[in-house]
Structure formats: C-alpha cells, structure tokens
Amino acid sequence: MNKKQLGAFLKVVYKGKDRPALTNILIDSIKGKTCLVGTNGVMLAAVFIDGLDEWVGHQIARIDLEASHKAMTSRVSDTFGANEVAEIMDNGRNVTTKFPDYMSLITPYLEGEPVGQAMMRFNADFFKVIQDLNGEDSLTVNLYGEAKPMVFKSERGIYIVMPMTLKKPGQAS
C-alpha cells in the first residue's frame, strides 16, 4: 500500500476508545490470501498483502499503523507491505483483545450473486475511502438487497460498506 492507501485504510479502522476491539487490525487469510482486516463498524476492509502467513491470527494496534503512516513519504517506492508488518510485529504493541468475527459477515458475499434493487441510500464519503484504499479510479459495487451491505471485490481486497436505512415517505426522521 502506498501512503494514500494506508491513510484510507486507517479511516476504516475505528479510532475511539469505547470499542477497543475495533481499534486493532487483524492479520488473517481469506481464500488462501493473507490480508489486513480493519473495521469501524460501518465499513470493513480486508486488504490483501502477500507474505503475512507467519502472523495470521495476530493483531496490530492502530497506533503502530499510524506511526508507520506518518513515517512514510509520498514517493512511489515508499510502500507498506510484509516487511513493514514484520517490523511492527517485532517492535509494536502486544494486542490481546479479541477481534470481532468479521467472517460471519463477509462469508455470504465471497461467493454469492448480487441482486437487483431499486434504491439504496449511502454516504459517498465512505465510497471515496474505499476507492482511495483500493487504488483504482472506479469501483464496482455488488448489491445483495436493500438492507444488506454493499460489497466491493478486487484483486487488492474485499471491502464492505453497511447501508443506511431508507426513510419511507411520511416517516419521521
């Protein structure tokens, strides 16, 4: 990940103190690809990074990832990958909180087919964060129903944005 992508990933990771499990990043494997998983309860990102096998199941504290982000320059050659994760695992904080069971959320969308729907309400800022994180000019969104998450799949990762509830005509806000 370049500096912009790492900054976007940090926007997906929860920042407050009231939900400590969400302030960490899980190193995991999805369909045989190692990844960093972060969520803030509204968005979830699983960014594929090769070479993390020995740390699967471990977590990185947000503050350690922030320090790596601050240390990066905007040069093309300055990227965050397996070597930087190794550095954090060797020198970073020991995280012992339990990461949420995100797989129960994303499993239905790893193979399922999207469905057509008439309308969905969303916050475009969340899409911009995912677009920056994925590093491409456009996004393809898979929709699975009005009250289901919006799912973005690419070679770089799997990203989920939870829908906002639609207000029905005449419904009080």
For the regions a language model picked out, list residue spans one by one.
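DNA polymerase processivity clamps
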Residues: M1-S173
